[in-house]
Amino acid sequence: MRIWPQTWAALLDVDLIEVGRKRPLVGVLGALRMLPDIVSHLLHGELPPRPPEHLRLRDLATIPLDKGGWVLLGLREQDEIALGLVGKFWRPVIDFASVRSAQEFVDFSEPGFAKTIYALSVRELGPRRTLLSGVMRTATTDEQARRWFRRYWTFGVGSGAHLLVHGLLDVTREMAEERAAQHAT
């Protein structure tokens, strides 16, 4: 990847909805993950919530927690962003914990939950060269949650998560390279 400032801007601007459109498999996986929530609403006589038109990485920490919003754990401008999410991800309709700050994320220990950190970074490798990387880590709050999460991750979800992360990084790279090309002209 080229041009570090454009890469950072592209990372924050990447639209997860657009990633699903540009990478059909990512879109299908996202739709499959949302399906149980939609069915649950319909079974309760409710209309499912409208999906957002855009879902940019920079906005994830502004989404309500019960809607899958992430907590901003740390931000080093032009360098790295870390987001956290606490929930029972293995359930068809995810039960999200109400964690509103980085400190609450660190302190959260209620049994039966998993805590995920998603860190994305941009590193300048030299003139016109940039490394964009993403790391996702999950820890559970107790042994039972660990068993549930391990089953969930092992039976295909882990592979799907890797496809989602790769799609996000790939679309970010494309955006950064396009911006760099526009900047050069």
Language model regions located:
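Beta-strand/loop substructures that line and gate deep hydrophobic ligand-binding cavities in soluble
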Residues: 103-159
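Short, solvent-exposed loop/turn segments at secondary-structure junctions
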Residues: 16, 87-90, 137-139
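Secondary-structure boundary elements
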Residues: 3-6, 123-129, 141-143, 169-183
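Short amphipathic alpha-helical segments with coiled-coil-like heptad repeat character
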Residues: 15-20, 80, 180-181
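Short, hydrophobic/aromatic alpha-helical segments in well-folded domains
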Residues: 10, 118-121, 168
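A conserved amphipathic terminal alpha-helix motif
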Residues: 149-184
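Hydrophobic-ligand binding "helix-grip"
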Residues: 62-127
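Hydrophobic ligand-binding cavity/cleft-lining segments
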Residues: 1-62, 67-71
